[in-house]
């Protein structure tokens, strides 16, 4: 390395540090998987973000965790593939493009299918570029040579292959079922696209008269407009109130239609009246009951949410207008006898905001039970998927054990077209990877597949499957770890697992690292309606990518939610700034040392031996914790080592030899500074890639980039437990003296007398050997160390391991003045404690104040109380 580069700018400026660095990494191909047979492969596929807009903080968190894992594994000598890509996000993207067209006064039907798809591809290209620029700002070590998109030709081929194979096995079928229907976009929705909101509604209590005139049966509903499609009333067969009515007939109000009373175990005798109206075309549970009792399915709505011909005089009315009118009519007929206000959870379309309608529709489905059974069996074997934290395995298995068939068709244009064709004359269905030969006689299904269908194949379709001889598939599949949020374990993780088992015969990933959701500093979910969302790019512009990454990675444990606050990001910036300043100091004192001149074989001080011991401990701890994905704990250990051990202690102690006359000691200290900084930057690199690369490039080093530098390993001969114990005692002594100085308001510049009474001669000897450090950091005019130190009047004392420190106050401070000053401080703190306690005992405040405000007040109470006790203790010591 050119020694002239061993200087760094005075100030830490993240934008300057991060500028052009990513291009250097990408152009150097440091992130590309090398297909090196000498190295063990390690694979991660990125959860593909939707091409609908900007990445949010959740994406930044998720991808930072993956980057940490892959950077570390690359440094550990693995042939790492971190495969990037994006999801076409069917309904989400189509909704965005349609909104754009509406602004131009157009609809997709004005353009036609081909032109609309052309428009959507243009949208995709624009936003894909934007997402790549955000990946770059975050510093993600992605292999762009293998980037994939869920509508790529290769992935489309895999989708068709899977559809056909499942169809041939009887696991894909076409049939009628109740699906989530969005009347605004006129398409089926997956469960994850339905957002539940509490809505003020009502229970409408009605009496359906028995045909024989012997009475009536009471039912209640929140959707009275659906009664027009009722085809039965159900009761529990063991219900003594109603079992004699099973098989009888009631007259459906308004319509005059006769419908049966059926007995079904599904009915909860304890809920409501114990009798329920059955509308098989508008409720999933009613649909199942209808199947069991062979009931007619009467659909009373159109796809746009208006009432159809079966709704009689209400035909053409909007469903909610119909509700109002039908309530009036039922009241007039005398069958509606009570309206009970009720807040209930109602599904809304994530895209359009419309109230979702449970709707009978002919759709394509995957028969889930056989696939789920295979996934459940896998978890009983050694080849199971390991969930981190493992509690999420129960969540996963619960979903798999209670699985329903999966509706996979969507009434959209953007997506994978269903590979099914219908003969124009005979109506015969043909399913195939390619179109039938006489294509002119066939019409392809107009629907597309649910986005999750292609996403479920992501780990292997991106590797070249169904070509099982593809080099990447053979080498890099199955993958090592999937990093994702707990909110999509069912919708995505579970589907990848059962498709992986079905089509590759093995789990698609060994581990699943689950993280939580990002919330604001009050613990609320980030949302547009609350206006509390944060753009990660804004955070990067202000504090740099490294500060954001470090906060995201170390701010919580696996599976836990993360509270975002700018104050916490600022504190990580302060950490980065501390590292920068410490590195500048080290480099300024290296005197142009080259990599070849590094020499750690010289005689070492206790501080040298201690910092090397602590480095070894940190390397081992960090490596073990990172392998368990405990990045919060990794961050804590790195922070403590860098801030406390290296910056606050070792660098200060290193100034003694660096500013001294002993050239051999100087050389050893410089070498240790360079070595510890180098190893520490490597440990920190996966978390703060830009800063560590910048510092490492200024250090004496071998190699082109820290991204491919070797991961640190503990050097056994550098561990010296005796020196570590000596240093621990030294630090205790120095800290205790500093605390006493602080308590009696005496600055370090003012000399003190210091007596150290040890419990054994050995401890006295150890302290005497390191006397220069005690003198350097406590500034005594007199220092006595021994076992026979006599008691001193009017002195402050402190106890450390094996010794008592005595610091005489005579001549150091005016004791009466100090007591007076402390008394004023005590009075002030007492008032603060009383003020906070008064607030916390106020019932009105406790009822009305937000939880976080109450917590803040409780924290203040604890803080003021602790400070008051400390001042009381000091006053007592001074008086005695």
UniProtKB/Swiss-Prot annotation:
Gene Ontology cellular-component annotations: cytosol
Binding site for ATP: 528
Pfam assignment, any one: Anticodon_1
Motif range ('KMSKS' region): 525-529
Record key words, sorted: Aminoacyl-tRNA synthetase, ATP-binding, Coiled coil, Cytoplasm, Ligase, Nucleotide-binding, Protein biosynthesis
Subunit text: Monomer.
Chain's role: Catalyzes the attachment of valine to tRNA(Val). As ValRS can inadvertently accommodate and process structurally similar amino acids such as threonine, to avoid such errors, it has a 'posttransfer' editing activity that hydrolyzes mischarged Thr-tRNA(Val) in a tRNA-dependent manner.
Family label: Belongs to the class-I aminoacyl-tRNA synthetase family. ValS type 1 subfamily.
Motif ('HIGH' region): 49-59
Biological processes annotated in GO: valyl-tRNA aminoacylation
Subcellular localization(s) per the UniProt record: Cytoplasm
Annotated InterPro entries: aa-tRNA-synth_I_CS, aa-tRNA-synth_Ia, Anticodon_Ia_Val, M/V/L/I-tRNA-synth_anticd-bd, Rossmann-like_a/b/a_fold, tRNA-bd_arm, tRNAsynth_Ia_anticodon-bd, Val-tRNA_synth_C_sf
UniProt signal peptide: none
Record's catalysed reaction(s): tRNA(Val) + L-valine + ATP = L-valyl-tRNA(Val) + AMP + diphosphate
Principal subcellular localization: cytoplasm
Description of its domains: ValRS has two distinct active sites: one for aminoacylation and one for editing. The misactivated threonine is translocated from the active site to the editing site. The C-terminal coiled-coil domain is crucial for aminoacylation activity.
Gene3D superfamilies referenced in this protein's UniProt entry, alphabetically: HUPs, Isoleucyl-tRNA Synthetase, Domain 1, Valyl-tRNA synthetase, C-terminal domain, Valyl/Leucyl/Isoleucyl-tRNA synthetase, editing domain
Underlying gene: valS
PANTHER family in UniProt: VALINE--TRNA LIGASE, CHLOROPLASTIC_MITOCHONDRIAL 2, VALYL-TRNA SYNTHETASES
Name of the protein this chain belongs to: Valine--tRNA ligase
Enzyme Commission no: 6.1.1.9
Keyword Aminoacyl-tRNA synthetase: yes
GO MF annotations in UniProt: aminoacyl-tRNA deacylase activity; ATP binding; valine-tRNA ligase activity
Keyword Cytoplasm on entry: yes
Coiled-coil parts of chain: 809-880
């Amino acid at each position: 390395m050119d020694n002239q580069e061993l200087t760094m700018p005075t100030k830490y400026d993240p934008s300057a540090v991060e500028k052009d660095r990513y291009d250097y990494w990408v152009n150097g191909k440091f992130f590309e998987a090398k297909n090196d047979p000498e190295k063990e492969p390690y694979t991660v596929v990125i959860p593909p973000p939707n091409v609908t807009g900007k990445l949010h903080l959740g994406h930044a968190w998720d991808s930072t965790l993956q980057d940490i894992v892959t950077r570390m594994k690359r440094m550990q000598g693995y042939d790492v593939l971190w495969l990037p890509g994006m999801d076409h996000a069917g309904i989400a993207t189509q909704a965005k493009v349609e909104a754009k067209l509406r602004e131009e006064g157009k609809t997709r039907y004005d353009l036609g299918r081909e032109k609309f798809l052309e428009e959507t591809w243009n949208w995709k290209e624009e936003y894909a570029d934007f997402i790549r620029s955000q990946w770059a700002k975050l510093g993600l070590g992605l292999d762009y040579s293998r980037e994939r998109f869920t509508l790529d030709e290769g992935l489309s081929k895999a989708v068709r292959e899977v559809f056909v194979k499942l169809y041939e096995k009887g696991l894909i079928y076409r049939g009628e079922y109740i699906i989530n229907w969005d009347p605004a976009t006129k398409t089926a929705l997956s469960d994850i696209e339905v957002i539940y909101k509490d809505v003020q509604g009502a229970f409408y209590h009605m009496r359906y008269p028995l045909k024989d005139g012997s009475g009536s049966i009471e039912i209640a509903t929140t959707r009275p407009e659906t009664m027009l499609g009722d085809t039965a009333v159900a009761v529990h067969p063991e219900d003594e109130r109603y079992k004699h009515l099973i098989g009888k007939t009631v007259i459906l109000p308004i319509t005059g239609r006769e419908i049966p009373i059926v007995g079904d175990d599904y009915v909860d005798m304890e809920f409501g009246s114990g009798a329920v109206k059955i509308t098989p075309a508008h409720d999933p549970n009613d649909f199942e009951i209808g199947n069991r009792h062979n009931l007619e399915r009467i659909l009373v709505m159109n796809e746009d949410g208006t009432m159809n011909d079966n709704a009689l005089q209400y035909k053409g009315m909007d469903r909610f207008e119909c509700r109002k009118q039908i309530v009036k009519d039922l009241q007039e007929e005398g069958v509606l006898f009570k309206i009970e206000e009720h807040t209930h959870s109602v599904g809304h379309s994530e895209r359009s905001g419309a109230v979702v309608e449970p709707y009978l529709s002919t759709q394509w489905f995957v028969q889930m039970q056989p696939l789920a059974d295979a996934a459940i069996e896998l978890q009983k074997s050694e080849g199971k998927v390991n969930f981190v934290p493992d509690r999420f395995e129960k969540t996963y298995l619960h979903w798999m054990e209670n699985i329903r068939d999966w509706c996979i068709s969507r009434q959209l244009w953007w997506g994978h077209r269903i590979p099914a064709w219908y003969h124009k004359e005979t109506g015969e269905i043909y399913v195939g990877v390619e179109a039938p030969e006489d294509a002119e006689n066939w019409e392809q299904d107009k629907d597309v597949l649910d986005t999750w269908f292609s996403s479920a194949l992501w780990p292997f379709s991106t590797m070249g499957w169904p070509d099982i001889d593809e080099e990447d598939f053979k080498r890099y599949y199955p993958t090592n770890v999937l990093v994702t949020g707990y909110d999509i374990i069912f919708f995505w993780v579970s589907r990848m697992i059962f498709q992986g088992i079905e089509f590759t015969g093995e789990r698609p990933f060994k581990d699943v690292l689950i993280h939580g959701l990002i919330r604001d500093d009050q613990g609320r979910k980030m949302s547009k309606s609350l206006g509390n969302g944060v753009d990660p790019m804004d955070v990067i512009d202000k504090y740099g990518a490294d500060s954001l990454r470090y906060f995201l990675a170390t701010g919580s444990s696996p599976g836990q939610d993360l509270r975002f606050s700018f104050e916490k990001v600022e504190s990580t910036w302060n950490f980065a700034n501390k590292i920068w300043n410490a590195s500048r100091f080290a480099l300024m004192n290296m005197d142009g040392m080259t990599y070849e001149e590094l020499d750690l074989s010289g005689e070492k001080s206790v501080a040298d031996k201690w910092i090397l011991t602590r480095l070894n401990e940190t390397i081992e701890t960090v490596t073990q914790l990172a392998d368990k994905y405990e990045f919060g704990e990794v961050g804590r250990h790195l922070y403590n080592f860098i801030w406390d051990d290296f910056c606050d202690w070792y660098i200060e102690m290193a100034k003694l030899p660096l500013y001294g006359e002993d050239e051999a000691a100087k050389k050893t200290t410089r070498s240790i500074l360079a070595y510890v900084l180098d190893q520490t930057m490597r440990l920190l690199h996966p978390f703060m890639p830009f800063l560590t690369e910048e510092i490492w490039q200024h250090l004496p080093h071998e190699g082109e980039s820290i991204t491919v530098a070797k991961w640190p390993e503990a050097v056994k001969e550098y561990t010296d437990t005796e020196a570590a114990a000596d240093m621990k005692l030294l630090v205790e002594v120095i800290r205790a003296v500093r605390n006493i100085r602080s308590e009696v308001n005496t600055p370090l510049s003012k000399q003190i007398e210091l007596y150290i009474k040890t419990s054994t001669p050995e401890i006295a000897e150890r302290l005497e050997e390191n006397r220069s450090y005690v003198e350097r950091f406590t500034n005594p005019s007199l220092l006595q160390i021994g076992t026979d130190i006599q008691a001193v009047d009017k002195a402050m004392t402190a106890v450390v391991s094996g010794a008592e420190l005595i610091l005489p106050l005579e001549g150091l401070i005016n004791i009466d003045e100090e007591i007076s000053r402390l008394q004023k401080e005590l009075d002030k703190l007492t008032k603060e404690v009383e003020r906070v306690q008064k607030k916390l005992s106020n019932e009105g405040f406790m009822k009305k104040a937000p939880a976080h405000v109450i917590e803040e007040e409780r924290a203040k109470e604890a803080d003021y109380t602790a400070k008051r006790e400390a001042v009381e203790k000091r006053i007592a010591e001074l008086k005695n």
